[in-house]
Amino acid sequence: MMSKNKIFIFANMLIFSIFIMSCSSQEYTTAKLAIQQSDFSKASEWLPKAMEVEPDNPEIPMVMAIEIHAQNEDWNEMIALFDRAMRINSEKVVEIRGAFISVKEAVSNYVEFYWAKEFNEGVAQFKKM
């Protein structure tokens, strides 16, 4: 017979597992796992599917913008996805790369970051002339 401590631990793990599974769709969970494994091809396949299943989740277009399009320097698509996330809910707090931040603040931070990165690369190229 199981001890009370083991039953308590098992019950907590079961509740935690149910909570985690109810938070995200299977598609989004698959995409996040692919990102964690640096399988960006698989992530780019699953993130659009996740957006179809969870059209009201601004975190998904944010993640796709940052992890797929920004990495590929596809700035137009990155901005389009940022705009989509802002239209869904600019005030919602989402998890981006382990940080919890509002969509509006994340968009501002990442646009500024990538703009500065491109600007600095341009300056470096200019100095080589």
Model regions and ranges:
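Amphipathic alpha-helical repeat scaffolds of TPR domains
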Residues: 24-32, 58-66, 95-129
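Short coil turns that delineate tetratricopeptide repeat
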Residues: 55-56, 90
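Residue-level detector of the short coil/turn that links helix A to helix B
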Residues: 38, 72-73, 129
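Conserved structural position within tetratricopeptide repeats
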Residues: 48-53, 84-87
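TPR/TPR-like (Sel1-like) alpha-helical repeat modules
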Residues: 69-94
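Alpha-helical positions within canonical tetratricopeptide repeat
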Residues: 42, 76-77, 121
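Alpha-helical solenoid repeat scaffolds, predominantly canonical TPR units
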Residues: 34, 46, 77, 81-84, ...
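C-terminal motif of bacterial Sec signal peptides marking the signal peptidase cleavage site
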Residues: 19-22
